[in-house]
């Protein structure tokens, strides 16, 4: 689907109804290099600007640079959006977007029966299936009969959309996350304007990359309109929340602020000792910024040293904390 850089979305020839939902949950899943964290973050930002309350849950592979297409290398980003205040991610997904068979295998169990499953059909070749440990193609085996499956050749369509930019094949393929984002933004009645503006600001020093990502985004949006693959669009109305200034906060940031508050309220100085490991490293980085409150942070050489220094500090009379994640535990 061809789309100029600043073109308006094409008009739908069929009146596709808008279904109003109180809440919805979406997950983007693919290889750790497929940009799923970025895709989820941008859809979250768009949903916030639309007035929804939003809660997110990113998931990273524990392995360092797991082979592409394998189960160990799957990265995903969950978000739940609601017209009411929301406190936790949903137990089951309304929509699952998968970029390859490994992402499908690792995440399908979390999609509700009758949920929408958007699949990059270009990545279901024999070698892709083998790496994901599939003995037969799930697109043909009947395994997906309980879901509303939408197969889209995302890779091919992305390359076609960005062809005019002259990007290499590798760089062109990397834009496919924005194609999938365009599809989902159409599905949930979202404007592309904020995402376009963000792309152009983020890649202002690389105009060809900015143009390619915008083209892919618009192409995904247009594709969802023209192919009539979806029976309805879904609108989650704005949440009714008290007026005021709101901010985005991660669990790690909230935990860090909680540590500062606990230290101040208890009258005890705080020591946080840990070995860096994603995503727990953010706590160490965050607490290091609050040394004006008398906090001390230690970047230990390993997890055993982090635990030992925390235990020793606790015996020494301070409020001692350590943290880790995944294989560190």
Model-predicted segments: where are they?
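Non-catalytic terminal/interface segments that mediate subunit docking, oligomerization
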Residues: 14, 28, 38, 239-311, ...
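Conserved beta-strand edge residues that scaffold enzyme active sites
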Residues: 61, 327-328
């Amino acid at each position: 689907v061809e789309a100029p850089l600043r073109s308006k979305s094409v008009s739908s020839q069929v009146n596709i109804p808008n279904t109003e939902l109180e809440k919805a949950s979406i997950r983007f899943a693919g290889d750790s290099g497929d940009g799923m964290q970025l895709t989820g973050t941008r859809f979250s930002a768009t949903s916030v600007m639309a007035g929804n309350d939003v809660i997110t849950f990113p998931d990273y592979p524990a392995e360092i640079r797991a082979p592409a297409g394998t189960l160990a290398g799957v990265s995903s980003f969950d978000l739940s959006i609601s017209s009411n205040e929301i406190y936790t991610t949903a137990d089951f997904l309304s929509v699952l977007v998968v970029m390859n068979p490994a992402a499908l295998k690792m995440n399908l169990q979390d999609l509700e029966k009758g949920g929408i499953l958007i699949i990059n059909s270009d990545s279901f070749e024999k070698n892709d299936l083998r790496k994901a440990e599939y003995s037969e193609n799930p697109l043909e085996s009947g395994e997906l009969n309980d879901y509303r499956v939408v197969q889209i050749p995302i890779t091919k369509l992305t390359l076609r959309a960005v062809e005019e930019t002259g990007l290499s094949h590798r760089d062109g393929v990397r834009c496919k996350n924005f194609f999938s984002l365009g599809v989902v933004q159409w599905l949930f009645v979202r404007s592309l304007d904020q995402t376009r503006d963000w792309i152009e600001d983020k890649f202002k020093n690389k105009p060809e990359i900015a143009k390619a990502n915008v083209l892919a985004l618009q192409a995904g949006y247009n594709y969802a309109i023209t192919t009539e693959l979806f029976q309805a669009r879904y609108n989650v109305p704005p949440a009714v929340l008290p007026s005021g200034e709101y901010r985005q906060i991660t669990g790690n940031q909230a935990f860090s602020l909680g540590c500062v508050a606990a230290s101040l309220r208890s009258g005890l100085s705080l020591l946080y000792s840990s070995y860096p490991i994603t995503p727990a490293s953010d706590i160490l980085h965050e607490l290091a910024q609050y040394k004006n409150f008398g906090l001390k942070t230690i970047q230990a050489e390993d997890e055993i040293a982090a635990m030992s220094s925390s235990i020793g500090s606790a015996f020494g009379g301070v409020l001692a904390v350590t943290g880790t994640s995944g294989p560190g535990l």
